């Protein structure tokens, strides 16, 4: 904006100086010449065209011929001062200022420096020690529950020997045969929801002994088996089992017999046993 104002002021000063120069007497005839044409400045404010018309010099009459008698001629010189009225017509054309900014970007060629760096890469591979994980499986403990076989106890009672002594000459020995019936009963099992019933096997053992003529033995003070007195504190014979096992076994037999009697003799259902 300041640049435009400065340029316009400079052009005005130039025009005023030019018009002052044109107002002087140029020696033209008295006829008023046509006013000099002044070009209207174009729209460009920076260019001012000034046309200055220079008038031709006045033509002087030829001198008179020379005579013997000098004649004195008085020349009356009239100075006509003609002031020219300079009419400056300024046409101010206001045009929209179109500022065209042309940005020319000149890219310099990019000079790429290729620097080849030789990089020595030393790769150190450290192998970790191989960790061998030994998984030791515990041996599978197989618990084998062995049920004791049903012990069939055959109780053989010795037949009672009745010796009848008669004065008759004939001595008769009466041997009573006794049949011992051994009942095999079930071993008590832990009852669950399902009660299984084992078949009861009956073992009948018939022992026949030969008839012998018996003699009444004399009473002795020693026990028959040669053992010490029986009881909790006594020493069992060698053929007898251990007392703890024998007690358990006899209790089981008693329970089995009771169950058998309730089931088969009394007729109680299984779920009540």
Curated annotation (Swiss-Prot):
Domain of life of the native organism: Eukaryota
Region (Disordered): 47-225
Biased composition (Low complexity): 47-57, 83-225
Protein name: Salivary glue protein Sgs-3
Organism the protein comes from: Drosophila yakuba
Keywords: Repeat, Signal
Coiled coil feature spans: none
Signal peptide residue numbers: 1-23
Comp. bias (Pro residues): 58-67
């Amino acid at each position: 904006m300041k640049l435009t104002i400065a340029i316009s002021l400079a052009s005005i000063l130039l025009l005023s100086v030019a018009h002052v120069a044109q107002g002087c007497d140029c020696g033209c005839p008295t006829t008023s010449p046509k006013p000099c044409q002044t070009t209207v400045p174009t729209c460009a404010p920076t260019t001012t065209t000034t046309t200055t018309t220079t008038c031709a010099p006045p033509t002087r009459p030829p001198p008179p011929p020379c005579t013997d008698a000098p004649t004195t001629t008085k020349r009356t010189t009239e100075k006509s001062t003609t002031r020219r009225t300079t009419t400056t017509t300024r046409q101010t054309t206001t045009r929209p200022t179109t500022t065209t900014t042309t940005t020319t970007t000149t890219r310099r060629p990019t000079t790429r420096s290729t620097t080849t760096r030789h990089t020595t890469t030393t790769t150190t591979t450290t192998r970790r020690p191989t960790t061998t994980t030994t998984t030791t499986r515990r041996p599978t403990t197989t618990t084998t529950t062995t049920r004791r076989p049903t012990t069939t106890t055959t109780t053989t009672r010795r037949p009672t020997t009745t010796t009848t002594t008669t004065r008759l000459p004939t001595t008769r020995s009466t041997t009573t045969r006794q049949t011992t019936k051994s009942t095999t009963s079930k071993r008590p099992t832990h009852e669950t929801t399902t009660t299984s019933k084992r078949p009861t096997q009956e073992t009948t053992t018939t022992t026949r002994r030969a008839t012998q003529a018996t003699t009444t033995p004399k009473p002795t003070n020693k026990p028959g088996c040669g053992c010490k007195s029986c009881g909790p504190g006594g020493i069992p014979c060698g053929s007898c089992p251990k007392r703890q096992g024998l007690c358990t076994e006899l209790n089981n037999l008693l329970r089995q017999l009771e169950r058998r009697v309730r089931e088969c003799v009394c007729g109680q259902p299984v779920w009540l046993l």
